[in-house]
Amino acid sequence: MKNRNPLIRKLLTQYFVTTGILLAFLVMIPLVIRFIAGTRTWYGTEPIYYILRFFADRWLFCVAIGALLIWFGTTIYYMTKAIGYLNETIQATTQLIEEPSKRITLSSHLIDVQEEMNQLREKSLQDQRAAKEAEQRKNDLIVYLAHDLRTPLTSVIGYLTLLKEEPQLSNAMRNRYTEIALQKAQRLELLISEFFEITRFNLTTIVLQTETTDLSLMLEQLTFEFLPLLEEKNLNWQLNLQKNVLATVDTEKIARVFDNLIRNAINYSYPDSPLLLELVESDSIHIRLTNRGKTIPEEMIGRLFEPFYRMDSSRATATSGTGLGLPIAKEILLASGGDISAESKDETIIFNVRLPKPANN
């Protein structure tokens, strides 16, 4: 730990200072004895005379023995103190492993170590919670994916079984059942494709084939392509796109980002409402997509882009979405040096996209 060295230095300083003071006191004793001995005339009948005479004749030996005892005593004392600190730290480490939920408390001399160990404990608890949440989201995704795979697959099997077992069906009904089975199979293909794509983005580094792209033109083309879908829900575009906004991006992947965002906005918009798309270039390139829909709770906003998080636990498939479009969009934007965020209030949903300006700008 980074706080061990100051504690060791402190103990060593105390050890040497204490030893030095005691040795200085020891050296002064012979001087005091000599001073006392010289203050008067002593007689052999006085008991203290023999003591003074003993120290006067053997003062060097006495000082050496005293110095040895001082060194031995202070060394034992501070070694015991250091071992006590070590044992206290070992016990705290054991507690950190066996009882991570319990706060660590050490003696006042180890307050810095205590704070650092408690910080490690908190981080470990946070990591454990995050790992459990991630594992739970993965388990939920498997359940949801199995449900979403089974639903269209069941429909495909059902309609194909009808076609096989009902030879008397009219051509019109056969065509209708075939068309429905094809639509369900296409949804199944889309779901599997997006699931593998988000998994690939999470496990590998996204490789970008960058080029200079006119975002203004790209967004205009995308909005035109979505007109049939907008007409189905009586939605309409409100565009505020700055002209000639260039960006160095992977054109195909960035188009995928805006395709996902627009589909999401269409799926979750109220009928007969506008979709506002804005493009502005300032210090960075900013794209904002606004639609009218059910307000997203604040606690769910930050988790919209998590691959294994679902806001709607019921997993209604009325929108025909896979639920993986937003995580894919964020992965692409982060790899492109940009970012994405969302906000929602008063039945309005806003997605904000930021991209870096080209280096030559």
UniProtKB/Swiss-Prot annotation:
A Pfam match: HisKA
Which keywords annotate this record? Answer: Antibiotic resistance, ATP-binding, Cell wall biogenesis/degradation, Kinase, Membrane, Metal-binding, Nucleotide-binding, Phosphoprotein, Transferase, Transmembrane, Transmembrane helix, Two-component regulatory system
Instruction: List the GO terms this entry assigns under cellular component, sorted alphabetically.
Output: plasma membrane
Per UniProt, what is one GO molecular function of this protein?
A: phosphoprotein phosphatase activity
TM helices/strands, residue ranges: 16-36, 59-79
Q: Which residues carry this modification: Phosphohistidine?
A: 147
Entry comment on modification after translation: Autophosphorylated.
Coarse class of the protein's main subcellular location: membrane
**Stored SMART domains:** HATPase_c (SM00387), HisKA (SM00388)
Instruction: Name the residues that bind Mg(2+).
Output: 252
Induction of the gene: Expression regulated by upstream promoter elements. Part of the probable VanC-type operon associated with vancomycin resistance.
Residues annotated as domain Histidine kinase: 144-359
The reaction(s) this protein catalyses: ATP + protein L-histidine = ADP + protein N-phospho-L-histidine
- Which cellular compartments is it found in? Membrane
Q: What is this protein called?
A: Sensor protein VanSC
Species source reads: Enterococcus gallinarum
